[in-house]
From Swiss-Prot:
Binds 1 Mg(2+) ion per subunit. 3-methyl-2-oxobutanoate binds at residues 45-46, 84, 113. Homodecamer; pentamer of dimers. The gene is panB. It comes from Nitrosococcus oceani (strain ATCC 19707 / BCRC 17464 / JCM 30415 / NCIMB 11848 / C-107). InterPro entries: Pantoate_hydroxy_MeTrfase, Pyrv/PenolPyrv_kinase-like_dom, Pyrv_kinase-like_dom_sf. NCBIfam families: panB (TIGR00222), PRK00311.1 (NF001452). Its main location: cytoplasm. This is 3-methyl-2-oxobutanoate hydroxymethyltransferase. It catalyses: 3-methyl-2-oxobutanoate + (6R)-5,10-methylene-5,6,7,8-tetrahydrofolate + H2O = 2-dehydropantoate + (6S)-5,6,7,8-tetrahydrofolate. One of its GO terms (biological process) is pantothenate biosynthetic process. Mg(2+) binds at residues 45, 84, 115. Its cofactor is Mg(2+).
Amino acid sequence: MGRLTLTKLQKMKRQGEKITMLTAYDASFAALLEAAGVEVLLVGDSLGMVIQGQESTLSVTMDDMVYHCRNVSRGSQCTFILSDMPFMSYATPNQAMDNAARLMREGGAQMVKLEGGRLLGEIVEHLTARGIPVCAHLGLLPQSVHRIGGYRVQGREEISARRIQEDAMILQEAGADMLILECVPARLGSKITDALKIPVISCGAGPYCDGQVLVLYDMLGISPGKSPSFSRNFLEGTSNIPNAIQAYVSAVKKNEFPLLELSY
């Protein structure tokens, strides 16, 4: 049995089956997540904060991402592996291609994720034309935290919401095969999910998207500092980590997480 494919994830969207995704950074947790039925492992540059103790994701390097992606690949057999491309690793089409190829060839990633809107259209086209699947990332962009003035909800104003939706359509047209929406109002998450053919995964974008993703350490209630308001500590009330992961998967599949009243 091989790894879950992009074709299967697209089929899940069409059939209305929720996609479960969690971040993973090492082989041991990758194995636990796979055993619990998580479909997608996101090797996130959030490792800069939860693994390395940095204040943001900006210091994470390509070598860091390849290292952790390789470990996650070794620890899993069937899950789909998505890897972040770190800050300034995709400034030009050729740089993006070289770095994405490293993540796939050396790290075992099946797809790479880029943060940003319509200006990334050329880079998305460049990658997908060369057989590299791309996940777009809109809404709150952690790699742009200094430009936007902190970790704030995006798309609350009509102009901002319209631009995010337009960006989503443009990136889909450019070839993106998946989209993560972070910290936007639930109504905007619903609107974009309905408008796109590709799977849309919510990270604080409400319950109406095609799937959900959380930072693993937030989901277990062990992240340093305060977890996002839309998150939930699934370890609370369960006896161990495997049960907490299974509770997350079950809650997403049954539309019991996230709660609309805790969405933006």
